[in-house]
C-alpha cells in the first residue's frame, strides 16, 4: 500500500530525538493520581538508583539501565555512541557471543541508544529470567572488556550505521539546520559521530571513556513487569552492591544563546518540497515546560487550525513535533504543499495559524482537551509493561517522577499556554526553512578506506555458556501456558469478537480487522479505491461531521482509528460511549462529495510522490520480477488509477468489502465480558452484509524458469547500497515445512548480533551494520527474503556470503544448541508482545487477515518443539540460493 509517510519525512528531515505530538492519546484521568501503588525505590550504598514497578499483565519483564552520559560529554565526536556499541561486545567474564547466546536462550529482546544527555540499555524478557538479566547488566557496568580486536570490527559496523544516516535524502540539510538552530551549544554537532572520528578512535579511548562515566553512582536501574519487588531488590543488591561507587567527571554547563531570526533555503533530493518553521521552547528544567507540552498537543489536535489546512486541501499534510533537552526545547511545524502550491506558500499558512493564535488566543476547548489527553497517558502507561518502564526512564532523565510530570500538566492554565506561545513562537526568534525539490546529479564521495573488512580478526564462534548461565537456562522449553486468547463469540450477522478481562489499567483497547483483498477484487484501472475509502472514514459520519466526531472523542479522551483495520482506546468507565462512536464511524460514514474531492486530490498527490521514491521503484521492480504476467500481485496503485476512481466507486467498494461476516474484534481491558457483549450486540448487531462472502484464493504460484535476476535503482544521494534478495513459492501454514522454515528464519536474523546473518556479515566481516531476513506465509503463498545495507564495494562480498550460508544450511544440519536458541526465541516472541493491552489484542487477531487462526492452536507449538535439525535442513531446500530476485538501491545517477 502506497502512502507518503509524514512521520517518516520528519524522521529523515531534522533532528534525532524528535518526538511527534500525537493527535489522540489514551483514556483520561481527571487529575494526576498519587504515585502508582506498589512502586519500590531504593538507592544502594554505591549510589545506584533502583526503581521496581510491579505489573502482572503478562509473565514478562523489562529492565532499563540509564547512565548519565551522552554525546554532550563526548571527548571525541561519537565516543559515547561507540561505547554503547562496544558494551555489547562482551566483558571479562562473558564474551560477546555468549552474551548473544544467553539472550537468545532467554528469548529476550535487547538494544540500547545514545542521546545527548544519557545512554539507555534495555532488555525485554520472560520474567522468570529477571535474575539472569540483572547479572548481565551488573557485569556490563563493572567489567566491559572493550578489546582492540573487537573495536577493529565494530568500527566497520558503526561506520555503516553512519553511512546509512548519510544516505537519507535530507541528511545534509538537517546538519545545516542543526548548526544554525543550536549554534553555540553541543547540540549543534552530529551526536552519533562521523566516519573520520571513528577512524581515529582507539579501543583505549573508548575504555577510558567507559571507566570515567559508567559508575553505579551515575546510573538508574528500572525493573518493570511480573516481578516480586522485594525479591528483585534482593537480587539487585546481590549483583550490584560490590561495584564501587566511583566518581564521574563534572558535566559542563550548557549556555543557550538567543536564537536570532534567520532563513534557510535549500534544494533537496526529494520529490516534494517542505515549508518549516522552527522555534525555541522551554527546556524540561523550565517552569513552563508543562505548558509547552500542552501547546504541542494543541498543535496536533484534529480540531485545530493546523489540521484544517489539510482538511481544506491547502496542504498535503502538516506535522508538529518537538525536541526536548533540560536546557532548552525545540518546536517544529512542517507543511507539505498541496499540488500547485509552493513550500513558501505552505510555510505562510503555518505562520498565519500562529499569528491568529497569538492575536486571538488558543481556543480554550482545545487547551482543555489537550491537557486531559496528556493526563490520560498516565492511565495507559499501566496497560503496557514496557511503556510503564520507559515512562519512568524518561522522567528519570528529567530528574523527576512521572507523577511530578503529570502534576505539572494538571496545573497548566490557558494563560500559561498563551504566554508560552506569545513568548517563544515569535517571528523575531525563529528559523524559517524552505526545502525545494531538486533531484541531485552528484554522487557523494566516500572514504575508500572506511568500513573495510578486517581480515585479521578471528571470528567469534558460539561458545559454551558460563556455569551460572547454564544453570539458570537449563529448564526445558514448554508451550505458552495459561489463557492467552479468549473464547470467540459470533453475532447473528457473522461478526466475530472475543473479550479478555485485564485489570492492570482502568482502560480498554478494542482492535478490529476486516478481511478484504483489493488485489483480487478492485475494479481494473481503479486500483487504490480502498485507500480512498479508508481515508474518507475519518471525515465524519451521518451523525457527526469531521470536527464533531473529533469533539465526541475529546469529550471522553478516547482515540479511534477507522478503516479496514480499526481500533479504539477508551477509559473503562466510557466503554459503551466509545463503542458507540467506533460503530458510528465504521457503519455510518458520511461520504460527503466535498470531502471526497479533497481526499482524492491528496491521495493522487501522495501516490505520485511515493512513486518517485527509490524504495517504491525497487518494490515494484521486485514484484514484476517475482510474479508472472496476469498475476494480481503485479497490480499497482498509480495516480491515474486513483484519478479514475469516483465517489460511487468508493461507496461500492465500501458496501462490498466492509461486511460483518469478514470482521473480527478483540476487546482487552478492564471490562467484564457480559458488559462488552451487550455493547457489541447493541451497536454492531444491526450491521448487514451485502451478497455472498468473497473468496480470497489467489492463483497458484507456478515454478518459473530458474533465472537469477538483478534490478538496480540509482539514487544520487545514497552513500550505501541497500540490497534485498527475495523468493516466492507455494505454501500454506499447514505445510510440513512451515514451522521448520520459521525456525530457520529465526536463526538467520532473530537473535540480534548472535544471529547467523549478523555473525557472518557484521561480527566476522564488518560488511554491514545490520542484516535481516523475513519469512511470511499468507493467502497468496510464501515469501522469503534477506536484506542488508553496505558500502557499494562490499555488496558482492556480502551477497556471496549470504548464498554460501544458505547452501551450508542446506547441506548440513544445524546443531541442537542452535535449534534450542531458535525455539526459545519463537516461544518468547509469543509471550513478549503480551506485555500490553494492545499486544494482547493483536495476538487475538493474529492471522485473521490471511484467514488463519493457528496462533491459539496447540498443534503449532507441538510441531515447533518436535522440529529436528534435519527437518530444518530439508525445509531450507525450498530456497534456491542461486536464483534470488535481487534489488539493489545504490549510489549513482
Task: Pin down the residues of each PLM region.
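Buried hydrophobic packing residues in well-ordered domains
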Residues: 47, 65, 81-83, 103, ...
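M16/MPP (pitrilysin/insulinase) zinc-metallopeptidase core fold and M16-derived inactive scaffolds
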Residues: 62-124, 190-192, 300-315, 327, ...
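M16/insulysin-pitrilysin zinc metalloprotease superfamily fold
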Residues: 89, 93, 124-155, 233, ...
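Bacterial N-terminal signal peptides
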Residues: 5-16
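Scaffold signal of the M16-like zinc-metallopeptidase fold and its non-catalytic homologs
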Residues: 90, 133, 165-215, 236, ...
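Acidic/histidine-enriched alpha-helical segments
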Residues: 104, 145-163, 228, 247-261, ...
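A structural supersecondary motif
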Residues: 276-278, 299-337, 385-388, 724-728, ...
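Proteolytic maturation boundary segments
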Residues: 18-51, 228-267, 273, 280, ...
